[in-house]
């Protein structure tokens, strides 16, 4: 079973809260994607290259027809003619190449693409064609155009070798000369005009941004449901762990009480052992019994009573008399009933036997019990025997 610390549990709760907030505040997925990318696998590089090529195509105004280039190469060089301010650039003649180019690009993009992607690209191409027509047909384009006489003061702009992309066609009124002139009014219009300009002319001096490949685009957020299920599983596991920890705490809370109860039991057992030892000492008939097995053996032996008068001949003395003791038992010799008069005092033999039984019944080390027994045998007075008895009770 995995264990979690308090810090890990707090981190899990914070992470789950952050994920839930992101899920609540996240934007809805498009209806056409349904959690998956509309671009098939393996087509990203081809589509990105085609789109970059489509974006890099120059407007038709900056390109010359091949037949005109051939004719201009064959014709002798003529001086440049000025363009009038009110002459609009050619627009209608330039639309067919643009449409053909868009159709070619769309044909390339349709390879391996889905219907939703093709529809999106068609809309973008329509918007780009409308944006091309807007700036050329605007009524204010005369304000942005400049006559070609000012090109003499700006030779750097007129250099067609450094900027071949800035070349534009001449006005329709002067098409008879078939001369290509560098027209800078169109470049400034592409910079100053407002609105959508998807096909602005390139300039090496203005390219400050680095192109980024479309291969590393972020996938759609289709793993939210998986994250939610993972977080739910983690929360369930954390709750189970917390419940098990509570059970462990409840079970371990009784350990100190159990220790105190065990100590009390030890004390009770010691008191009972001392009481049993004293009971053995006070029992004069069982002074030599120090174990339960010996006590049971003594209990098994019981006296046997023989009924009838019996044979009194062994107890009959001369003259047909019989000597009886205090318990009315026959005594074979009457001299046993006569005892010498002695001073009254404690019997040292009985006291020694009692202390010996006490030492043997006590749970002591064998060396300690042997030492006390040797002292008991060497004792010659009641006081010494009582001292040995105290040592046996205390040890």
Curated annotation (Swiss-Prot):
**Disordered as annotated region, ranges:** 46-105, 127-181, 193-217
Entry's localization field: Host cytoplasm
Composition skew (Basic and acidic residues), residue ranges: 65-74
Q: In the UniProt record, does the keyword Phosphoprotein occur? A: yes
InterPro entries from the entry? P/V_Pprotein_paramyxoviral, Soyouz_module
> What does the entry's domain section say?
The N-terminus consists of a long intrinsically disordered tail. The central part contains the coiled-coil multimerization domain (PMD). Forms a four-stranded coiled coil structure. The C-terminus constitutes the alpha-helical domain that binds to the nucleocapsid (N-RNA complex).
Indicate the quaternary assembly: Homotetramer. Interacts (via multimerization domain) with polymerase L; this interaction forms the polymerase L-P complex. Interacts (via N-terminus) with N0 (via Ncore); this interaction allows P to chaperon N0 to avoid N polymerization before encapsidation. Interacts (via C-terminus) with N-RNA template; this interaction positions the polymerase on the template for both transcription and replication.
The protein here is known as: Phosphoprotein
Origin species? Newcastle disease virus (strain Chicken/United States/B1/48)
**What gene is this protein a product of?**
P
